[in-house]
Amino acid sequence: MSQENSNVPALKRTESKYKIGRVKSLPTVQIDEKTGDSYIELAPRSEGKIYGCTTFQGNYKEEEKLGQGTFGEVYKGLHLQTQRKVAMKRIIVNQENDLFPITAQREITILKRLNHKNIIKLLEMVYDFPPESNNKDYAQFNQNNSANPPAVPKKFFYMILPYMVADLSGILHNPRIELKMADIKNMMKQILEGVNFIHCSKFMHRDIKTANLLIDHNGVLKLADFGLARQYYGSPPNIKFPGSAGSGAKYTSVVVTRWYRAPELVLGDKYYTTAVDIWGVGCVFAEFFEKKPILQGKTDIDQGHVIFKLMGTPDERTWELAKYLPGAELTKTEYKSTIDERFGKHLTPTGLSFLKGLLALDPYKRLTAMSAMKHPFFQEEPLAADRLTLPCEESHEADIKRYKEELHEAMSQKGPSAPPGHIKEATPSPAKFEKKSGIKREQPYQSNQKNDQYPIKRQKFNQNPSVPHPQPKANRYGGSSLPSGPKYGRYEGNNHSGSLRNRITPSNMGTHSNPRAENMGSKPYQSEGRYSSNEDRKNGYNRGYSSSVNSRYNNRAAFNETEDQSITTTTLNRYRHKGYHDNNQSQTRLQGHSSLPGKPTSKYNSTQTNIPYRRTEIPNPNEYNASKLGSQDTKKNDYPKHSETQKQQNNEEKKIHSEQKDIADLY
């Protein structure tokens, strides 16, 4: 009785606590006729759903397409319930009968097992139609029974990942983002922490590069794209040695993007270690300073030569086992290391030692992630920033093309400019000129009229426009008396050749007007006539300046009769081009011109074209007549002697003339 009574309450408690529902029928076990193995056949889930996957409808909304490549499309989306931005990565299945890709299977499995702040997190899997596809057209076809049915949409697998505002590749190519050494150290520490966690979890990433290093809006860096990652079976890494491949384990050597591929992979080693990821970290660290991949090989063989050009050809000291690898032929070409010259200007000796440790040729001498985090490089100033702060602008790898187009457009609209402050120091503004002498200088011309093509002050040449301009005096050959041609400098407005018969002689020298200035309403000015006697040399007239300089000067600084005419006239006469006349040849020759017949009558040799300027009292040029200009009574050495003060004034006036010439060239 006691036993029966004790069992009754127990049954009541069981009935009240547990509810028996509908029992699921077990699938029928079948036996394979060929192999004899037993198996069960699973029926597909209703509505085409996959276990562990959700759909876009009611859960996610696509916003824009971020990019497209060999991996497929990546969309920027929004989780409707939490309003959280996500990235939706499509997994490619090339053919209808293909199985689920092994790379995607590895990536999903590894991301489910890794949980670290510096590793991207897999939020969810989606199995649905592409976001941009429209299923309404296909539904209407079934209702209307149209003759031309639309293409049946295909479902794909999508990985739902957190949306990251930037990747390291986009940041390095963004011209508006400038990274400091404290920011670089902050990102390097985050990269090494993530890589160390992956290696200690007995995985190898095998695709470390700037495009796979993502950064969120809080400045947290995360490693992404584990499509090439895999598990290794050897011992995990420590402070000295990397994680080993394991006994008898052989891996494929065609991994890692070529420009970030370690030398042991280039030489065909299939028993590599976790050190292949450390080489990629070193390439990323060096890329901070050159803003581009540092080892850009065109082929797999060329990649080996590029590596050895930077680090030097391996020998018994740097990499003893390199000669036993399948691609050891590459090590026969002798190269010297250039890493010191290439990166020594960017890094301190400690930073250069850190880079060499990451890029050591021997994988067993290469730094591990654990030892790299303890390197003295992170203890010296400046220390790593506590938090990475970046501009609000999003920067992805897909934006690099846009950055290059913006730079090309800016360069096409803007001409090449000198460095800041260069133009200001070389050609200062005329208003800021230091007044070195009593000579009055003209101000630069600023016109509001569109037709003005030359910087000339109109009021300086013609204060009364009603006065007609005299025509230039014609010489006996019917042309202008102004000489031209490559031998005698540049004379605007003269179309005659530079023959000897068109040169100015004392008989045809007079007052002429510049045709270019005449078209602009300018006032006639005195010609570029050359004084041609030895007496002129005695009086100190300078013949060394080229005719083009005098033409530009007279166009810009012709004297103004309403102002101080004595100063302006003296200024003009000082900078006029002077020549001399040889009565024996009855022709005027330029001083020192070796191509003309006859010998120069001065003491300067034929190769000297610029005669030093000599200052003396200059009389009014209108007082010179032909007889005075043609006289040759003065001896060669009868030059006036000048004091040191006069020589100093001459040098100052030379500088002023050079400055005025530079201003004329600018306009």
Swiss-Prot record:
Record-stated family: Belongs to the protein kinase superfamily. CMGC Ser/Thr protein kinase family. CDC2/CDKX subfamily.
InterPro entries linked to this entry: CDK, Kinase-like_dom_sf, Prot_kinase_dom, Protein_kinase_ATP_BS, Ser/Thr_kinase_AS
Binding site for ATP: L66, G67, Q68, G69, T70, F71, G72, E73, V74, K89
Species this protein is from: Candida glabrata (strain ATCC 2001 / BCRC 20586 / JCM 3761 / NBRC 0622 / NRRL Y-65 / CBS 138) (Yeast)
EC code(s) of this entry: 2.7.11.22, 2.7.11.23
Region (Disordered): 408-667
Gene: BUR1
Name of the featured protein: Serine/threonine-protein kinase BUR1
Catalytic residues as annotated in Swiss-Prot or TrEMBL: D207
Lineage, opening ranks: Eukaryota, Fungi, Dikarya, Ascomycota, Saccharomycotina
Principal subcellular localization: nucleus
Localization per record: Nucleus
PROSITE patterns: PROTEIN_KINASE_ATP, PROTEIN_KINASE_DOM, PROTEIN_KINASE_ST
Superkingdom of source: Eukaryota
Biased composition (Basic and acidic residues): 432-443, 633-667
GO biological process: positive regulation of transcription elongation by RNA polymerase II; transcription elongation by RNA polymerase II
Function: Serine/threonine-protein kinase involved in transcription regulation. Phosphorylates the UBC2/RAD6 ubiquitin-conjugating enzyme (E2), leading to monoubiquitination of histone H2B and the silencing of telomeric-associated genes. Also required for histone H3 methylation. Necessary for the recovery from pheromone-induced growth arrest in the cell cycle G1 phase.
A single Gene Ontology CC term: nucleus
UniProt KW keywords: ATP-binding, Kinase, Nucleotide-binding, Nucleus, Serine/threonine-protein kinase, Transferase
